Amino acid sequence: MRVKLCGAAGGRLGTLAGLGRSGAAALALPGCLLYTRTGTAPHLTLDTLREVSGVPPVAQLTLPAMAELHDVLAEYKEGAAKFIGMPDTVLYCSLQDPVAPCPSGYNTNKTVSLWSSSGRMEMTASKFMDIQRAIQPDWFQCIADGDTISGEVTRKRAKKSVDRSLSFLDACLQLLEKTPELQGSVMFGTIEGGDVLEERLRSARETAKRPVGGFLLDGFQGRAMAKETKMNLISSVTAELPEDKPRIIHGVGKPDEVLECIERGVDIFESFFPFQVTERGCALVFGYDYLSDPKAEAALKQNGAQDLEKNSPEEDQEEEVVKADPEMTPFEIFLKEKRYHDDFRPLLEGCTCYCCQRHTRAYLHHLLVSSELLAGVLLMMHNFQHYFSFFSAIRDALRDDKLDQLKKLIFRQALQGPENAKIDQ
């Protein structure tokens, strides 16, 4: 596995080549992973997933879900990729599920707590590596003490998280050498330290001294950390890392945050954000065509997530019994709203996804208010494809030296919604 960079300004444009046991797969950078739940894309079968364009070659498994299958996979002996029916997919196993809450205060010097549907599991380095031996992933995040995202982490606690994580890393590296089933697997070192710059830098420098295949920037999930602090820490950490190894970040998915992290040297992101949007009954409609094309500008206005045509105050608002999720972002539309019941446009004008080519907003509104399972399937197909296409647009913008233009477009939509964002001439 090796990073080949093209030297574009504003981000690390290139390719992560030599992936998988065969070494034939490659991931374009900056890029994202395919988010899965127990090895399956949410709401989708393998057949419906094949209808989605731009699916990344690397799928993300989460350890809490896979740990429950440990005994089954250990008996199966052929690894999770073949077990889930995706033998040609490169698998990355992360320590936590980015969507699931992770209670604080349960890690110790010897164990890290995972939270699954069956409750809390305590994970030692030895038990962790036993599970990885059964999963046989191509990449996996090393066990680490990432309990530093509450916003109230002291310098002492940040230091402890780094010390514990380095201790876990050394133990797992020793076990990796003695595990023949994982000789083709790559371990990613986890960089911790909360919001304490000195500890973040120490974690990055010490982790970079170990024989890891890449780096995982952890602890930047959620809103506990101020945005300016978060971005300054990411810049400082990536400056300490070798150029020839990939950098993954967990818990960052919104388009504006993704662009800021890319500018600061991050390579790979998760794709949990489209899943969260789908679970809210929403569709991604933000524009990412940064070229000065009048047709693109017109389509962007037409696809506005914050339509000015809101229900007027005179209308009976009691009919609007379903309220939007408070976590909803300006990049999406809430299709349960009554105004979509007779909106016969596709979710996104110009979108080539399976859903937009065949169905309308009105039909999705009907499926959602009727609690039909098909709603999740169609929304997931659209949201995944739109999100994957966004990363393709980022790479094009880097290649064309237009990242600033794309960033302006995305940031205007973050503030105003797609309808009111204008594309600079």
Swiss-Prot record:
Main localization, broad class: cytoplasm
Renumbered residue ranges of the record's region Disordered: 302-323
Membrane topology (UniProt): Peripheral membrane protein
Single annotated GO MF: protein heterodimerization activity
Keyword Membrane: yes
Subunit architecture: Heterodimer of a catalytic subunit QTRT1 and an accessory subunit QTRT2.
Name of the protein in its database record: Queuine tRNA-ribosyltransferase accessory subunit 2
Organism lineage: Eukaryota, Metazoa, Chordata, Craniata, Vertebrata
